[in-house]
Amino acid sequence: MKSVDNTSELVKEISDKFVKEYCKSLDDLMLVIREELQNAGEITDTELELHILDLANTLYFTGSAQENLGIKEDTCKAIRAELYNKTYEDSKGTVAQKNALSELATQQETIVLNIYSRAYKKVKLRMDAGYEMLNSLKKVMNKRISEIELSNSRYIGGNRNE
């Protein structure tokens, strides 16, 4: 049990380190938006435009970082499979014994694979939340534009009738 706790804590710490590194800009921007919403209540049009542009840009670079994690995950899978197969080939005994030896030989690679896999999933979750925020900001902007257009059409329409 203690071994599981230690290993899982190690996986969590290292994957969190990757996530912090790759998502720092996105996390910082999401915190700024949250603080503005909590403190000011309403974001100005200029701030809204800036956040839409900044968030789209940040998501682009975070997506690139996520793909780098995916590449590392794929590479780790290949290395693990290669070691597993080599150990299986070189082992003597029954199929069950060969499988057990191969699994034992690839424990470290499996842990590294889990680290990259968890980090990839965590970055993806943050990116998904970032896209949700971006879509929400766009909806707010579109609503404001519609309200302005409606107001202008009433004003212009009112002038024609006078």
Residue ranges, per PLM feature:
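Short acidic DE-rich linear segments
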Residues: M1-D5, S153-E162
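Extended, charged low-complexity scaffolding/tethering segments
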Residues: M1-I43
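Long amphipathic alpha-helical coiled-coil segments
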Residues: K77-E82, V112-R144
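Amphipathic alpha-helical coiled-coil segments
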Residues: T58, T62-Q66, G70, T106-M127
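Short, charge-rich amphipathic alpha-helices with coiled-coil/heptad character
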Residues: L31-F61
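Amphipathic alpha-helical interface segments
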Residues: T46, A65, K72-T75
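Long, highly charged low-complexity segments enriched in Glu/Asp and Lys/Arg with interspersed Ser/Thr
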Residues: Y22, D28-L29, A129-L150, G158-E162
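Extended, amphipathic alpha-helical coiled-coil scaffold segments used for oligomerization/tethering
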Residues: G70-I115
